[in-house]
């Protein structure tokens, strides 16, 4: 299902449903479509679901870092929602959620992390990006998932176009470096809000030990595993993911 993107002066975002505000933050390589199932599910369960388009490629080069993106999300919540929200962040979106929770705790009622960066993650490494090699990009995209068929041709084409756009390629590398540099380990014990950690057991990008460490260092956190699942649980095992998260929020 294609959702209508609202285009305001400062923000482009999807907004579906009424009720408790839920803000979904996408990752570096993931667009809004990664959250299709979540938007459908939660917008019908008494939630007001927002998916802002993060300005990953729109920032000046010198400001292309996670702190700037976290400030953007804070502004979005302040101006479009105006009250504390539940943040759900996947991959880099989780990292942005962690930064936001530690810098603007007044805006975050609950934090949900899935395949979140912030401690460490495996990146494309020194070989990124091998631009012209579509097979390589296909293989790397498939590695994100437990089930490689989720890496559809459409998704591979998106990633391929991204790494072949020189400016976007540079900014992708800068954000990946910013994620590695901005390690959150010392900040985790200071997080006061409830945190739900939902992780794919077969996540190759942010391996399971990241989830175990986050659970260990974040005081008020719960950890849930999804089996036969990689780095984007809400996309790969949507029913299970939505069920776990819905129950968790209901109990808070």
Predicted regions mapped to residue ranges:
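Alpha/beta-hydrolase
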Residues: 25, 54, 114, 226-229
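Conserved HGGG/HGGXW glycine-rich cap/lid loop of the alpha/beta-hydrolase fold
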Residues: 12-59
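Active-site loop/oxyanion-hole signature of alpha/beta-hydrolase fold enzymes
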Residues: 36, 44, 50-88, 243
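Conserved serine/cysteine hydrolase catalytic core
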Residues: 177-216, 225
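Gly/Ala-rich beta-loop-alpha elbow adjacent to hydrolase catalytic centers
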Residues: 89, 93, 97
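Flexible "cap/lid" loop of the alpha/beta hydrolase fold
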Residues: 98-103, 108-138
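Conserved alpha/beta-hydrolase catalytic His-Asp/Glu region
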Residues: 131-193
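Catalytic histidine-centered segment of alpha/beta-hydrolase-like enzymes
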Residues: 229-238, 242
